[in-house]
């Protein structure tokens, strides 16, 4: 089950969001040592966690976070355009048909195989979600190691510029072109499976 959380239904998912923000702190602050704001000593929440953010969240039967990602509109404030435009050789792509993938977070307590399965379910849900909303392109900023994985997943993806060293970590920007062929391309590499979640198709963004 993948929950799609927006400003319209966020009140229903407060506990799941809190669990997600706690894991984001464990992963990005405690493990990766990113210099990010921490709220109440527990939650990694930044300026982009606003009313325009869309979250895809997978939880266990108790509502605890297993994996998540955040999607941001690029015609508004977003990470690539605001913080890392220099990673793009021709400027950060912005449009109402472009969304940015951010904060892909997998529960660090899960075994590696489980994390991979959760990641694939999140990617599948993301593809279904953006196709349903006629989003044509996804962008993002990731470490060079994860960028290499993204480029090999099978979809139409390319770097937006050369990776650069930032605060001791090599990072790069990418774009993914999304269309009706994307699910099939990802199925060929064992990543995509259709995700059935009733509420997301009815959810207003």
Predicted regions and their residues:
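Short amphipathic alpha-helix that is part of the acyltransferase structural core
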Residues: 1-44, 59-62
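Short, solvent-exposed loop/turn elements at beta->coil junctions and helix N-caps
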Residues: 40-47, 161-164
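Short hydrophobic/aromatic beta-strand element in the GNAT-like acyltransferase core
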Residues: 42, 53-57, 68
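A short helix-loop-beta-strand connector motif used in the catalytic cores of GNAT acetyltransferases and
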Residues: 47-56, 76
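Short, His- and charge-rich active-site/binding loops that engage polyanionic ligands
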Residues: 59-91
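Short, charged, solvent-exposed linker or helix-capping segments at domain edges/interfaces
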Residues: 81-82, 112-113, 183-189
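Acyl-donor binding region in acyl/amide transferases
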Residues: 85-171, 175-176, 180
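Charge-rich, low-complexity intrinsically disordered segments
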Residues: 100-103, 169-205
């Amino acid at each position: 089950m993948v929950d799609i959380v927006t400003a319209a239904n966020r009140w229903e998912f407060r506990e799941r969001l809190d669990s997600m923000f706690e894991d984001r702190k464990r992963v990005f602050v405690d493990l990766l040592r990113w210099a990010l704001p921490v709220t109440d000593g527990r939650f990694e929440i930044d300026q982009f966690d606003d009313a325009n953010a869309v979250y895809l969240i997978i939880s266990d039967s108790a509502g605890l976070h297993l994996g998540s990602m955040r999607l941001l509109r690029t015609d508004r404030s977003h990470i690539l355009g605001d913080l890392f435009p220099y990673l793009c050789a021709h400027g950060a792509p912005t449009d109402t048909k472009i969304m940015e993938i951010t904060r892909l977070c997998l529960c660090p307590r899960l075994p590696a195989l489980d994390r991979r399965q959760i990641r694939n379910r999140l990617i599948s849900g993301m593809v279904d979600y953006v196709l349903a909303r006629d989003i044509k392109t996804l962008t993002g900023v990731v470490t060079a190691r994860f960028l290499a994985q993204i480029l090999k997943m099978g979809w139409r993806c390319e770097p937006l510029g050369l990776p650069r060293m930032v605060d001791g970590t090599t990072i790069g920007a990418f774009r993914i072109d999304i269309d009706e062929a994307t699910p099939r391309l990802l199925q060929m590499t064992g990543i995509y499976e259709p995700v059935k979640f009733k509420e997301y198709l009815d959810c207003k963004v």
